[in-house]
Amino acid sequence: MERREHTYGYEDAAGVTPPPWTGSAVGLMDLDAFFASVEMLDHPEWRGKPLIVGGDAESRGVVSTCSYEARRFGVHSAMASAEARRLCPQAIWTHGHFDRYREVSAQVMAILADETPRVERVSIDEAFIDITPGRFAPEDPLFVARRISDRVAALGVTCSIGVGCNKTVAKIASERDKPFGLTIVRPGTEQRFLAALPVSAMSGIGRSAEERLRRMRIYTLGELSRAPESTLASIFGVNGERMRQRALGLEISEVTSLDEERKIKSVSNERTFAKDLTERGDIEAAIALLGESVGRRLRRQGLTGATVTLKLKYSYGSGRSAQRRLPHPTDDENIFIAVALELLDNIWQEGMHVRLAGIGMSDFDHQGGIQTDLFCEVDDRGAQSSDRRDLSVAIDAVRDKFGDAALTFGRQSRFND
């Protein structure tokens, strides 16, 4: 496969050398159909064929990822396996091997770290890099990105890379020419690059936000960038102006290095309620909602924690917390939420009014990930089961694409603060 390469604003300027890069240069490296690509690396006979990595249709599994050949039939991540089998009955199915994916991911991350000290892993198959000339890279970002692309391809998998002045531009650029694409958005061309794109192209705008923007007759990022600040604030609050700045290509974002990631001591989420919670069912639902956010952040950062902390503050101002150590590190919210609900008995009794609740994970295994096969069952509490990890990955994918409200669980419907 030949790499597709574009330098935005200079596609039709044959022989014209773009001016030197000024300011920050952020890249987003995204491995193409990563799980499926690794399976094809280990099974060359599967190359060029529709391949699906996921759970069985018979056991109501879901698709974790699939090859581009399968995507042509309408199969996509987070789809029910039964529907995927109906759309593409000729597909090859595999249950995947997470240890192997971690191994290849580590090789790719090592390449990035060799090119720049500023590498921020977003997930097992995606990372931001700071390749600002003269700061973290010795040459123009185009040459650094080309070299990374070539070095990753030499491992037997491909990646798509977008480069721009900030994370928003880099992320959108990385999706322009998948698979095996390289898109460079030179300084000064950001607004032209973004203007015609639909608002959904920008991360953080899910289905609900997109619908509200449509009601305002805002369909493109260009229209969003021209919307009055007061109008956006009336609908989205303080996030409205941030959305507008991102649509203008003016986001200021810093890439966090791997060393800085390893300094993270805990990942937590807490919320102060407009009205005190007094019913156990409502408190449990709030803890579950907060715990889901923590689990998703752990998976994004490749972290697994071994200590669960539950924190409550009461209406009269005082608060209490409780901790428990798990037998195995995990990023599975089903495991640590269940433990947090057990801890609730230690710090809450009927009649107490809860003003704030928080849940956190700490004591991280910085190797990241679950040290078991992606789709095998493990019975001990703290080691994540395969079906749950499959489901967690699928839910993350749906929420990343359609927003957090796209999928909720029944117990959370009780919590409607």
Set out the residue ranges of the language-model regions:
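Gly/Gly-Pro- and Ser/Thr-rich, intrinsically disordered tail segments characteristic of DNA damage-repair
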Residues: 1-245, 258, 296, 382-417
